[in-house]
Structures are given as C-alpha cells and as structure tokens.
C-alpha cells in the first residue's frame, strides 16, 4: 500500500527571532540549521489542513545563498515524522508524541525555501512535502500482529466511526456531534477489531435532523462549538459485510481547546459534513480558494532547484527519532 500527499504551501512570517547575521557555511547539525528547520516545520504545522502535526526527524541538506539586496535564500531538505497530535490540537508539537513504528508510522519528506530579509527580519516561506507511511512489509517484519494502516475512506473505517459517534450522540442529551474528519483507521488482530481516530464538532441539529441526509447541520456559533478528538476500537471481523449494530467498542474523546482565531479554526467549516475523510492518502493536496488567508493564489515554482540542494559538508544531520 502506498500513500502520497503533496502539500504545497506559500506564506509569510513576520518577526523572526533569527539573527540578522546569516551564516552561509551551515552544516546540518549546526544550531542555526536547526533554527531554520524549526521555522519551516512550524509553518507546515500552522497551515496543514488535515491529519496530524509533524516533528523534525532529519535535516537532510541546507544551503544558504545570497539573493537580491538584503535577501538571503535558505534551501532545506527535511525528513519529518507524524505525531499523535491532530492539527486542531493546540498542544505544542514539542510536547506531542511521535507515532511509534509499531503503530504504522508515517514520514514526510519536504523541500523548503525561506526568503529572509536581514534588515526587516521578514520571511517568505515555500514548502512542498510528500507523505508516505512505513510499508506493510516492514511493519509485519518487525511486528507480525501490529495494526495495519487503512485508508480513512475504507468502508470498515467509516462504518466504525459512524457507529461510535451514534453511540455517543445517544448518550449526550441535548448535544449532537458530527464528524469533522476521519484521520486514521487501522485493522487490529487478536482480538480482531478496527481502530479509528477522528475529530468531531458540536452542531445546531437535533438527533433526528442529524440522521436526515437532506438536512445540513452547522457548527454552533463562534465561541460555543465544542470540538473533540476521538480514539475508538470497534470489535468486529473484517469479513463482516453489514454495518455494525451491537458490537462491543471502546472509545475516548478529548475536548480540544480551539480558540476563535486559532490557526486552524478554518477547519470547522472546511470539514463539516457527513463522510468527511482525510484526503491525505492516495491523493494530492494543493492550495485552492478554500485555503487559509495566509495562502496567496498565484503561480509559484513547484520544485526547488537541484543546484541549491546538492550535498554539502556535514549533511545529512543526525536522526532525532528513527528512520523508516
């Protein structure tokens, strides 16, 4: 199984804390290289529309070249690892747990270009990333019965999410939730089950209206919506062709403290609707009209020139976590 996601980002960051004395002879393990990489990773996490926050794993290459006037161009090749924090989770990425290899880890390779003005500290950032999970063969080689990643749109995954959400809504008098995004699904063994992770939001519907495919529910007004991230296991066979009805399940939902104006508050309207699965697997994601305000709709280069990313002394840097 192969998953591919291309994340194309263009934006602007003002007020950098980096020194105006930009070194041009950086090696991948230098402190300054880590600062540049952190800037790129922070930007990715602030503008990523789906799934999980990313953490720096390896600085593969860094090249700093003079540009026009006071501008300096910093070219980076980065390897990132998926964390267990959803993009809506306000937890700083430094405190997020890296998804372990036995839980079918996912890596992301990114090319980043940062245009830095040494006088004003203004930055323009361009990032392009491809996300790929560990291969099923590698997962099973290291752990024969570890859960295997499924597509978020897999029927068993979607059915499991709907089943758990309906059970929750039945128990919450006066509160109805809908799915914002199905972020992850896995097939588990001994006992056989489906493990799912998904984000939900409270909506202004009655329970009856929520079950009506012709009725469109909307999140509560700003400041009133409750957003939660759920992890659940539904115990059922992969061979089962019917939707779950009376299966045993375990679930845990945590309310996320997403403030109005938070970098990802746009996700509420971006995702709301039935069967909202993440497009991050087997798909390409690019900026369109619905992207956050920080994006600009104009032609941008899609590749970072190889002449700026040729291997340099001291690169690649050390592996901070593990290599897939």
Curated annotation (Swiss-Prot):
Keywords on record: Disulfide bond, Glycoprotein, Metalloenzyme inhibitor, Metalloprotease inhibitor, Protease inhibitor, Repeat, Secreted, Signal
PROSITE patterns according to UniProt: CYSTATIN_FETUIN_A, FETUIN_1, FETUIN_2
Glycosylation sites: 204, 282
Signal peptide stretch: 1-19
Gene3D superfamilies listed in its UniProt record: 3.10.450.10
Family to which this protein belongs: Belongs to the fetuin family.
Protein name: Antihemorrhagic factor cMSF
